[in-house]
């Protein structure tokens, strides 16, 4: 099994919606998936039909001294969700007060991996490098750095470090945009970790969260859903390739 982290090169690039879409695609392919919201924004739940007023989550449980496992939610027989949980206004203003407590989730994720219960654990990671985020990134077997083809992300790709071994996944690529086409050609020549898969702009991606469903469940026939399914297959092949390479060293 593998722990896969998805993190935006900046905020607002669609990481959360992509995480939900990839989790759905992997379970469509027969994989057992746990998707974990690692962001204090607590938005991943909104892609899995969780009531807006639901405040529970693994972080909320740890802060309240409760068992984080009770915060897990079943979406399908092969897809489970672990929301972050809602922080209070005071907690949001003082993140340093809870970073250490929430660090306990690291050992929990390692135990889940060792149990073999899930084929994949997907982490929806927030942008930035807080102590908690750095800890979770270090647990990942693979990391996808989500980027949009714009000047903002172009600059960031040259001035901020990506997680070790991360692959860059382009999201929201617009057909007919001269600027995006020019930058994309530059990235093809300069970004050695660029994935050979692109997620194009698709209205279904915006609509699915409004419908509180993962992309592939909401519109399986959409272009973006088909591209995410291709991404899921790439993840399976890439993970299998890593295991084969590791085995050949013995």
UniProtKB/Swiss-Prot annotation:
Residues that hold ATP according to the record:
9-16
Which terms does the record give in the GO molecular function aspect?
ATP binding; ATP hydrolysis activity
Query: According to the UniProt entry, where is the signal peptide?
Result: none
Q: Which UniProt keywords are listed?
A: ATP-binding, Cytoplasm, Nucleotide-binding
Which residue spans traverse the membrane? none
The record's GO CC annotations read: cytoplasmic side of plasma membrane; cytosol
- Top-rank taxon of the source lineage equals Bacteria
Query: Which InterPro entries did the record assign?
Result: Cellulose_synthase_operon_BcsQ, P-loop_NTPase, ParA/MinD_ATPase
The record's subcellular locations are: Cytoplasm
Give the record's family classification.
Belongs to the BcsQ family.
Q: What does this protein do?
A: Essential for cellulose biosynthesis. May play a role in subcellular localization of an active cellulose biosynthesis apparatus at the bacterial cell pole.
The name under which this protein is listed is Cellulose biosynthesis protein BcsQ
Q: Which lineage ranks, top first, belong to the organism behind this chain?
A: Bacteria, Pseudomonadati, Pseudomonadota, Gammaproteobacteria, Enterobacterales
């Amino acid at each position: 099994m593998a722990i896969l982290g998805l993190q935006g090169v900046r905020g607002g690039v669609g990481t959360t919606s992509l995480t939900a879409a990839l989790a759905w695609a992997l379970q469509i392919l027969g994989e057992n998936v746990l998707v974990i919201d690692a962001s204090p924004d607590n938005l991943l739940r909104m892609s899995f039909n969780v009531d807006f007023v639901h405040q529970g989550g693994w972080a909320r449980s740890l802060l309240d001294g409760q068992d984080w496992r009770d915060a897990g939610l079943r979406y399908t027989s092969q897809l489970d969700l672990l929301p972050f949980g809602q922080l209070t206004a005071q907690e949001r203003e003082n993140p340093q007060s809870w970073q250490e407590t929430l660090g306990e989730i690291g050992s929990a994720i390692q135990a889940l991996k060792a149990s073999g219960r899930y084929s994949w654990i997907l982490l929806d990671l927030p942008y930035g490098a807080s102590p908690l985020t750095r800890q979770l990134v270090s647990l990942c077997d693979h990391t996808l750095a989500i980027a949009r083809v714009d000047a903002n992300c172009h600059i960031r790709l040259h001035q901020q470090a990506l997680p070790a071994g991360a692959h860059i996944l382009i999201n929201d690529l617009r057909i007919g945009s001269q600027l995006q086409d020019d930058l994309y050609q530059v990235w093809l020549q300069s970004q050695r970790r660029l994935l050979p898969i692109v997620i194009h702009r698709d209205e279904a991606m915006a609509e699915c969260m409004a419908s509180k469903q993962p992309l592939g469940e909401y519109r399986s026939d959409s272009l973006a859903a088909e591209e995410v399914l291709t991404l899921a297959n790439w993840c399976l092949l890439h993970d299998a390739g890593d295991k084969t390479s590791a085995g050949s060293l013995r």
